[in-house]
Structure formats: C-alpha cells, structure tokens
C-alpha cells in the first residue's frame, strides 16, 4: 500500500460525497456522504471497515462543516496525515479545460467563469474546493472535469444550428457530461476485450439517475447526447431529455409558467418521475411496470426506446460499432433494460445471451451478446472516483 492516500470529493448543492482511496490498489479505505446541507437537519454518514455511523452537522450545516467533520473522522482513524492530495469532480470546464489540472487562483477563476454552463453544479464544486483548501491546508487540489473528455468532438457535432454569434459571444454549444466515466470505461472495455482502444468503435451508455450516451472512436469522444447542460438527450430519472424548445413559449403562454419554473420542471419533475407519476428510481419503475401500472410501463418503454434510438445514431458518429457498452447504476444492474434495448438492435447484429445478461450485474463485467453477434454488447462497471484519484496522484507528483 502506498504511503499517501487520495481524498476524492464530489459536491452537490445540498450534498457532499467523499472517498479516501489508495491510488495503487484502488481500495476505498473510508467513504462519506453528507446530505441536507444548508438545512438545519444536515448530517454526514461515514463508512469505515464496513461499518456506518452518522454525525450531526446542525452546528455548521454547510460544505465547510461537512469537510471539517470528515477531517475529524480521518483523525480518529489516523488517516489525516496520510492524505497526499485532494481530487474534485467538476461538472463543467467549458472550452477552457480539455484535461484535469492542478488548482491555483487562475483555475478557480476559470471554474467561476463556467458557472453559466453548469449553474446547479459549479457553484457547489467551488464551495467544496474552498472548504478543502481551508481545512486541508497546504495539500494540492486537482480538478477533474466531466466535460474534458468531450473536447475532442468535431465542430459539426458540438455546434448548435443557431446564429453562430451566440457561440462566439456566449459559448453556446454542446459540451456533454459524464466524461470521467467515459474515459475510465473506454479504457476498461478495451482491457476487458483484450483490444487496443484505438481499434475499437464504441457506443457507451452511462445510465443512472442522470443518463447519457457517447460515441467513442480512436479512444476519443466523437459525439454525446448531453448538450449545453445535462438536460439534453436521453429520458432520465427527473430530466426530460430531448424536447422541442417551443415548450418554453407554449407553457409560458398557456400555463403562465416562468422560464425558471419551466427549467425547474424539466430538470427536477420530468423524466421517469414525470411520466410515471411515481418515482425517479428505475428499480421502482421496473417493479411497478411488472405489476401493470400504466405510467410505469410507459416511462420504461420511453426510456428504452429513446436509448435504442440514440444507440443507432451514435453508431453513425462512431463510424460503425464494435462494442456497445452499458455502465452506471442502471446500465450495470438492470438486465431487464439491457435485454429490451437489445431487442431493438437486431438490425445491428446484436443478440442477447440471456444467461450472460443475468450474470453481468452487481459489479460483474461481462459480454451479454451471443457468439454469433456481429458486435459485442458488454457491461463494464464504472469507477469515476478511481479515475479522479489517478489524475490527482499524477498531477500532484505522488
């Protein structure tokens, strides 16, 4: 085990997720999740050696309070002195950053500049970053951008068909997300299949509460479904994905809704939750659909159909298909969704292997198509934290 450990932080507006990793082995020594930040009942849950315990944060219910509680927990286990650097997930680096970078004042200013591109996420990342700088004094901080991997997209893939001055003036274009996951999974897929990633044309579906899909060729992103923000593309847990932009004027005129209300509705009340009227959790949707609930059945079919359609279009972007890859919480665990998606893809020569599909769950990688399929469909568990740890160690010189 290497002497120095990496702390990885992923901050949301009301949450903070953390993990302490051994960069060499990938082992997670301690993890935490702070929830309800900025509310009086804020708390943080720690997991160490398989045991969990909860700490009240009501005295300081913000990101600094959460990072402070994390420092105390590390001290209690004698791990505080072994932290060598801190890695941070940042949703948007816009066009400023095409790779991970060591933090200085200029980088913080750059992340601030990208706030309009990720107004829900980047401010929270900055709170976590500043908290880490104040509590873990003197340690190097590294930021890893969700958008960086997609900076290889060609101009015709990232440009929107609107007046070009809007791009030049405001940076209005497709940026994508989940890039750290795609970078990890494209490497792992090649390793798992025993191929060079530069020889593989991949379509990778990262399916969780937020869901996106990316075409990868020559080891690089060629196109992706998320756009200016993570709202575009697939049907998601609470996000609508693709929708006619005229919805804004239609709802403003007919439902008397403001832009802020419509944006909030499309981000937080739509997707599986909005269609089903039940839940944003795919497991609940699958269970209720099996019982015949009409809303759940429709939500599931829409999720699957939209995904299958996008696989077809991303195959064009990749220049063909050698490997279709499922990852993320839903992609790694829902054999039902994978089977039904592949049911649409017989025209691509992809045929499900039922037994293999059932085995490839709960952290198990595996090929889930038959030997006579023209390409492979494969399940590869993602590990964004490990990718962030690797970048952090490398850029910190550990």
Model-predicted segments: where are they?
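Internal helix-turn-beta structural module
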Residues: 297, 301-322, 331-398
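Extreme N-terminal starter segment of soluble prokaryotic enzymes
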Residues: 2-7
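Adenine-nucleotide phosphate-binding core of ATP-dependent small-molecule kinases
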Residues: 264, 271-275, 282-317
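Catalytic phosphate/nucleotide-handling subdomain of diverse soluble enzymes
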Residues: 217, 223-255, 264, 328-360, ...
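Glycine-rich phosphate-binding loop of actin/hexokinase-like ATP-binding domains
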Residues: 151-253
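Short glycine-rich, Thr/Ser-proximal phosphate-binding strand/loop in the N-terminal lobe
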Residues: 15-60, 227
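Short beta-strand-loop/turn "lid" adjacent to the catalytic site in phosphate-handling enzymes
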Residues: 74-121, 140-142, 148-157
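Glycine-rich beta-strand-to-loop/alpha-helix junction loops that act as flexible
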Residues: 11-12, 89-92, 207, 321, ...
């Amino acid at each position: 085990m290497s002497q120095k450990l990496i702390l990885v932080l992923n901050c949301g507006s009301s949450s903070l997720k953390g993990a302490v990793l051994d960069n060499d082995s990938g082992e997670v020594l301690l993890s935490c999740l702070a929830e309800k930040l900025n509310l009086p009942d804020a708390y943080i849950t720690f997991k160490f050696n398989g045991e969990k315990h909860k700490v009240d944060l009501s005295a300081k219910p913000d990101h600094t309070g959460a990072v402070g509680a994390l420092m105390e927990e590390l001290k209690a286990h004698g791990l505080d002195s072994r932290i060598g650097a801190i890695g941070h997930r940042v949703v948007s680096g816009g066009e400023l950053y095409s790779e991970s970078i060591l933090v200085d004042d200029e980088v913080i200013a750059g992340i601030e500049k990208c706030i309009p591109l990720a107004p829900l996420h980047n401010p929270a990342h900055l709170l976590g970053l500043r908290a880490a700088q104040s509590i873990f004094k003197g340690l190097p901080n590294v930021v890893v951008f969700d958008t960086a991997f997609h900076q290889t997209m060609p101009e015709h893939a990232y440009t929107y068909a609107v007046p070009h001055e809007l791009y030049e003036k405001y940076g209005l274009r497709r940026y994508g997300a989940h890039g750290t996951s795609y970078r990890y999974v494209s490497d792992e897929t090649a390793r798992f299949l025993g191929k060079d990633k530069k020889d593989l044309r991949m379509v990778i579906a990262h399916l969780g509460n937020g869901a996106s899909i990316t075409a990868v060729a020559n080891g690089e992103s060629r196109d992706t479904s998320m756009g200016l923000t993570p709202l575009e593309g697939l049907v998601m847990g609470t996000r609508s994905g693709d929708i006619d932009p005229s919805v804004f004027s239609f709802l403003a005129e007919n439902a008397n809704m403001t832009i802020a209300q419509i944006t909030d509705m499309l981000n937080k009340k739509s997707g599986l939750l909005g269609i089903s009227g039940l839940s944003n959790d795919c497991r609940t949707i699958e269970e209720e659909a099996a019982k015949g609930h009409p809303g759940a059945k429709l939500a599931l079919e829409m999720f699957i159909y939209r995904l299958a359609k996008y696989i077809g279009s991303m195959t064009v972007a990749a220049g063909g298909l050698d490997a279709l890859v499922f990852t993320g919480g839903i992609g790694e665990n829902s054999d039902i969704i994978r089977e039904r998606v592949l049911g649409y893809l017989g025209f691509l020569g992809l045929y499900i292997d039922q037994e293999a599909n059932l085995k490839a769950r709960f952290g198990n990688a595996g090929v889930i198509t038959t030997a006579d399929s023209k390409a492979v469909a494969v399940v590869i568990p993602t590990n964004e934290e490990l990718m962030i740890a690797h970048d952090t160690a490398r850029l910190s010189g550990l």
